[in-house]
Amino acid sequence: MILATGSRVRLLNIRVKDLEAAAAHKFTLSITEPLTSLKRLRVIFDRNGFWTEDAGAVAIESLEDKRLVGTMQFYRSGPCIHGYEIGSILHDEYDRGKGYASEAVRLLTDYLFAQRPGCHRLQLIIEEWNDPSARLAEACGYASEGILRKAGYSSEDEPSDCFIYSRVRD
């Protein structure tokens, strides 16, 4: 099902044909489980289609060639927070810098605020070294709130500090 359409990309519910590409990226469909097994991905897909009240995953598809260029997820960031955290990844270096990610973040932000009345806050957590994602957050209307110390996960040796960005319902 198409969730939202922009000028470059559209967001869709995850489809069976998206699972193989998603499997190449550990945390692209779930932040709590590194999903790289096609068999495990299919079990979850068959159970709930990667869509629940508390979390969901979407495909980012290029309008130009109908190709899967990335995936996004949203999930409850905490039991007392009235909103979600959003994560995204473009699967191929080739697709970066084309505006796909920023449009996808804007589309999912608008979708969640429109479709989930109890959602009052969306947040992005971005590791300190990731300048392109920090610029993307600001370009999409997210405000920097501060630093989460030792919250990053990209290094196995030492967790890194992260910036937290949020956008609240108008």
Give the ranges of each region predicted by the language model.
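Conserved GNAT-fold acetyl-CoA-binding loop/helix
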Residues: 27-47
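Acyl-donor (CoA/ACP) binding surface of acyl/acetyltransferases
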Residues: 1-30, 57, 61-170
